[in-house]
Amino acid sequence: MDLYEYQGRDLFERHGLPVLAGGVATTPEEARAIAERLGGRVVVKAQVKVGGRGKAGGVKLTEGAEETVARATDILGMDIKGHTVHKVMITVTADVAEEYYFSYLLDRANRTFLCIASVAGGMDIEQVAAETPEKVVKEPIDANTGVDVATARRIVTQAGFPAEVADQTVEIAVDLWKAFVAEDATLVEVNPLAKTAEGGLLLLDAKVSLDENAAFRHPDHEALVDQAAVDPLEQAAKEKDLNYVKLDGEVGIIGNGAGLVMSTLDVVAYAGERHGGVKPANFLDIGGGASAAVMANGLEIVLSDPAVKSVFVNVFGGITACDAVANGIVQALALLEQRGEKVTRPLVVRLDGNNAEAGRAILDGANNPLIQRVDTMDGAAERAAELAAAGV
């Protein structure tokens, strides 16, 4: 889960890291109250989860409450790269002398954590690494030992931080690691980490991503979810313990196992190229226990998407045998009818693996005109795409 800048700033502040005083506003009047509380010159920043705010006019320096209200009025509702601005963060300004960069992240490619540090902050770190790689230090972090003072000092020294800020940077590096671990983050990035004219260090920006799989350890993280941006179908699926991601397509996908579902997305996309460009409408993994109730919940979620014109149910029987899955599909359609959910869109079902023949016989015996059984994955994808194209 990616946080807004103001949420990252608040998280840093809770962990004792030095940030600018400020607040977040959703209306011009709230912006006025914050500006009056802070006093003097402030900066008004659009809160969107995308870069390029400054160039788009989403960052403004203001003097006094009236100008802050005017600029907040301009920014709220602004569209920045397809993201509508609903909130602005207002902070005091800082007299910046130098800008540095510091981050911790989960390095999935190398299965470790990584610290990236540079004295060339305030710009895209990837650009810095490409143009002047000697200015960027990348240090793998052992999860068992973490970042203590000695490790932090080694990184700070290697990155070439000036002597006058070295001790402060070491302290921030240790505290930032503690925050990274405590919050189960996959990224904490400070760009810039600024040296002020007075010689102190401030975290002027906050980019934070949290591991949603660790949400059970962090009930407070629920408050960080941007409810306005949550897809209602994804939320409904989450409440039913289903792994669902909405996509932009017409063929609903239900499968058991993430790998199989990913492969199903591919074959449907390929088949769709021959049928008007139809595409997968979702990712939905019902897991290993495809009971009637689970299948009914899955079908209900998929069919709640009005863009779906056909559904491809792709199941490979393993621990859960295909005959159990077939019974689940038949019973699921009956359950949906009982719930008042009139199912009218066709289901293309492919069963393979454990007890596949028995499962196919159950589907054939159901005599449900909505169920079309196809025994190969490619053939089923072709049929589902064809039906979706015909129903568009």
UniProtKB/Swiss-Prot annotation:
SUPFAM superfamilies for the chain: Glutathione synthetase ATP-binding domain-like, Succinyl-CoA synthetase domains
Subunit description: Heterotetramer of two alpha and two beta subunits.
A GO molecular function held by the record: ATP binding
NCBIfam families assigned: PRK00696.1, sucCoAbeta
Cofactor: Mg(2+)
EC numbers: 6.2.1.5
Cofactor notes: Binds 1 Mg(2+) ion per subunit.
Gene3D superfamilies: ATP-grasp fold, A domain (3.30.1490.20), ATP-grasp fold, B domain (3.30.470.20), Succinyl-CoA synthetase domains (3.40.50.261)
Residues that hold substrate according to the record: 256, 318-320
Keywords, comma-separated and alphabetical: ATP-binding, Ligase, Magnesium, Metal-binding, Nucleotide-binding, Tricarboxylic acid cycle
Domain ATP-grasp stretches: 9-236
Descriptive protein name: Succinate--CoA ligase [ADP-forming] subunit beta
Top-level taxonomic group: Bacteria
Organism encoding this protein: Salinispora tropica (strain ATCC BAA-916 / DSM 44818 / JCM 13857 / NBRC 105044 / CNB-440)
Annotated family: Belongs to the succinate/malate CoA ligase beta subunit family.
Function: Succinyl-CoA synthetase functions in the citric acid cycle (TCA), coupling the hydrolysis of succinyl-CoA to the synthesis of either ATP or GTP and thus represents the only step of substrate-level phosphorylation in the TCA. The beta subunit provides nucleotide specificity of the enzyme and binds the substrate succinate, while the binding sites for coenzyme A and phosphate are found in the alpha subunit.
Any one biological process term the GO annotation gives: succinyl-CoA metabolic process
Annotated binding of ATP, by residue: 45, 52-54, 94, 99
Family annotation (Pfam families): ATP-grasp_2 (PF08442), Ligase_CoA (PF00549)
Enzyme class, first EC level, given as a word: ligase
Entry binding sites for Mg(2+): 191, 205
Cellular component annotations (GO), alphabetically ordered: cytosol; succinate-CoA ligase complex
UniProt keyword annotation of Ligase present: yes
